[in-house]
């Protein structure tokens, strides 16, 4: 779709531009708003993870809400970077930081037990907590594994939440257009994306299976916070802090651009970011954006529940629901074109011989099998999103029944003592 709709005179810059050219302005605004929400929540999720990391490094002596605030304040500074090109070297460094964390985490979990203090953030806790609850003598249940759906006291909620974690980890189509439009050599991005997806898929699958094999239901998300030796916890948390700050800066950069270019500029008449006034507004808006992300993080101190909710409501849509929906409309428009129709670049006039349901059906049946497949894919993705959203909301409701889990709490989600 990008190659078919992009042009030198009318370049594609955002995900919403695809929706605009296929379905019109209302759908474009809807996608831009949802994209802004996702990017804001992504920054919030990263603040939660690093708030947990800082609280773990401080051995839970520092208030959890303050830990989140420290990371948000760091975001005030890194958020002042306006162009994605300046993130290139930092993003590359972040990859190798994460690889280092993966290697060290695997080495540590292979020679030590799970982090029982952090069972509140474990996979077993998301399944009702029965498999990670100690007995009267304080002995924790043995490590167990499940080849199919794991046993749960909450029905299918925990299993669907686990599925949403996979969606959160692998879903990334939302930023495709933004990266393509900002890179001077799009073919390099295309090759880089394929290599990155292959690398991520292989590493994530192996790493996930490895940690689950050694820690079972005690596996924590983020995983490096589930290692038991404090020294290696600190190594992973400090390096993860730096890596996450780069990722949060990237998400915040694109999130602010989407908000500014598609809401402030279109609806409020704000000046372009390339102007002096635009740069001043950017500098002033960055703290506001990060403050909103901090409020989300501190108000919902449940990493597993929030990531599941963001995955179901946002990431799943941009990766699995919207692509077949957009491609279906794109193919219908192409298939409906009759001889003599088209756009005249000299006059700016679009010629069409008919319209309405007749035109839509003609376009649909032109590529019947492909269009039917994308329609089924779209509907299936909607059902999965509904199940994911329901499960995530129920998980958060159950989590907040715990008196220690409150908004803006000082008690770290990883401290189960």
Question: Which residues fall in each region the model found?
Answer:
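Membrane-interfacial loop- and helix-cap regions that link adjacent transmembrane helices
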Residues: 2-32, 44-67, 94, 104-315, ...
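Cytoplasmic-side transmembrane-helix entry/capping segments in multi-pass membrane proteins
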Residues: 39, 90-96
């Amino acid at each position: 779709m990008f190659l078919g709709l992009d042009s030198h005179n009318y370049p594609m810059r955002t995900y919403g531009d695809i929706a605009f050219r296929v379905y019109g302005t209302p759908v474009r605004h809807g996608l831009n708003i949802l994209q802004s929400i996702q990017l804001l929540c992504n920054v919030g999720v990263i603040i939660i993870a690093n708030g947990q990391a800082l609280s773990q490094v401080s051995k839970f002596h520092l208030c959890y809400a303050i830990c989140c605030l420290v990371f948000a304040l760091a975001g005030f500074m890194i958020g002042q970077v306006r162009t994605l090109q300046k993130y290139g070297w930092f993003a590359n460094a972040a990859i190798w930081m994460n690889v280092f964390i993966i290697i060290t985490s695997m080495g540590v979990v292979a020679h030590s037990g799970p982090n029982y203090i952090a069972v509140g953030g474990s996979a077993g806790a998301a399944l009702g907590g029965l498999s990670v609850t100690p007995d009267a003598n304080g002995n924790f249940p043995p490590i167990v594994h499940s080849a199919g759906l794991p046993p749960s006291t909450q029905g299918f909620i925990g299993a669907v939440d686990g599925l949403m974690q996979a969606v959160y980890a692998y879903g990334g189509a939302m930023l495709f257009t933004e990266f393509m439009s900002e890179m001077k050599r799009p073919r390099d991005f295309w090759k880089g994306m394929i290599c990155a997806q292959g690398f991520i898929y292989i590493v994530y699958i192996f790493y996930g299976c490895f940690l689950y094999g050694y820690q079972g239901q005690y596996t924590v998300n983020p995983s490096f916070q589930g290692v038991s030796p404090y020294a290696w916890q600190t190594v992973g948390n400090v390096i993860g802090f730096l890596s996450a700050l780069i990722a949060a800066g990237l998400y915040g950069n694109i999130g602010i651009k989407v908000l500014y270019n598609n809401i402030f500029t279109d609806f409020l008449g704000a000046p372009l970011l390339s102007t002096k006034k635009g740069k001043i507004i950017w500098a002033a808006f960055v703290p506001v954006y990060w403050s909103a992300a901090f409020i989300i993080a501190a108000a919902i101190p449940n990493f597993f529940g929030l990531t599941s909710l963001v995955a179901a409501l946002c990431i799943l849509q941009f990766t699995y629901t919207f692509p077949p929906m957009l491609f279906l409309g794109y193919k219908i428009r192409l298939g409906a074109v009759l001889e003599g129709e088209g756009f005249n670049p000299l006059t700016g006039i679009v010629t069409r011989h008919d319209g309405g349901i007749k035109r839509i059906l003609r376009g649909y049946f032109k590529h019947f099998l492909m269009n039917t497949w994308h329609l089924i894919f779209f509907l299936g993705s909607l059902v999965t999103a509904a199940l994911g959203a329901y499960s995530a909301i129920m998980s958060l409701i159950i989590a907040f029944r715990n008196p220690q889990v409150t908004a803006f709490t000082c008690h770290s989600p990883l401290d189960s003592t």
